[in-house]
A protein has these predicted regions:
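Short acidic-glycine-tyrosine-enriched beta hairpin
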Residues: 76-93
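Short, conserved beta-strand element in jelly-roll/cupin
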Residues: 42-46, 57-73, 113-117
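Conserved short histidine dyad/triad with adjacent acidic residue
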Residues: 24-28, 41-57, 95
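A generic structural motif
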Residues: 51, 61, 68-70, 77, ...
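Intrinsically disordered, low-complexity coil segments
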Residues: 115-130
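A short, N-terminal "cap"/entry segment at the start of jelly-roll beta-barrel domains
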Residues: 1-37, 131-161
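Ligand-binding loop in jelly-roll beta-barrel domains
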Residues: 92-119
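Short beta-strand segments
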Residues: 52, 80, 129-131
């Protein structure tokens, strides 16, 4: 049997490079459990912090489970206060857009789960993920972890002729 991991007690670490408002602490659970097809991370948010900007995925499905606290979810229908035990699924595409923010006065702890895309980079074997950030008109391609403005798009033949 794989050694169990307690998601309530797993140690989380902050990102020293995170800008104000995105200083949540996290622990990636997938590697700790040896997972290959499902990703999972625990996030702990202080009041005023968000996990990441409003976004949606084009290559993976994400799930959110609230462990403690009352985070606020922004989705295409607006903002909603969540409670411990709430479980949601964000499908691929614009309908699955979301952002999780702690607007309460106490810490929030959540788990985010995601499928891992099967399409992989030939050289490294890394999965390819494509994330869209509607508020900032960006698209992110992982790897290599670059973000681009959608409005900077070029034609198919640009630079080829």
């Amino acid at each position: 049997m794989t050694e169990p991991l307690n998601i309530f007690g797993v140690a989380v670490e902050g990102d020293a490079d995170a800008p104000a408002g995105y200083g949540c602490r996290t622990a990636e659970l997938g590697p700790l459990l040896g997972a290959e097809r499902l990703g999972a991370s625990v996030y702990e948010l202080d009041p005023g912090d968000s996990v990441c900007p409003y976004h949606y995925e084009n290559t993976e499905e994400e799930w959110l489970l609230v462990l403690t606290g009352t985070p606020t979810l922004r989705d295409p229908e607006g903002e909603h206060e969540l409670a411990p035990g709430d479980l949601l699924c964000f499908g691929m595409g614009p309908g699955g857009a979301h952002k999780v923010t702690n607007r309460s006065d106490a810490a929030v702890r959540i788990v985010m789960l995601s499928t891992i895309p099967e399409t992989r980079i030939a050289d490294s074997g890394d999965p390819i993920t494509i994330t869209v950030y509607p508020d900032s008109d960006k698209v992110s391609v992982w790897p290599p972890g670059k973000r681009f403005r959608m409005s900077d798009g070029v034609g198919y033949w640009d630079g080829e002729l």
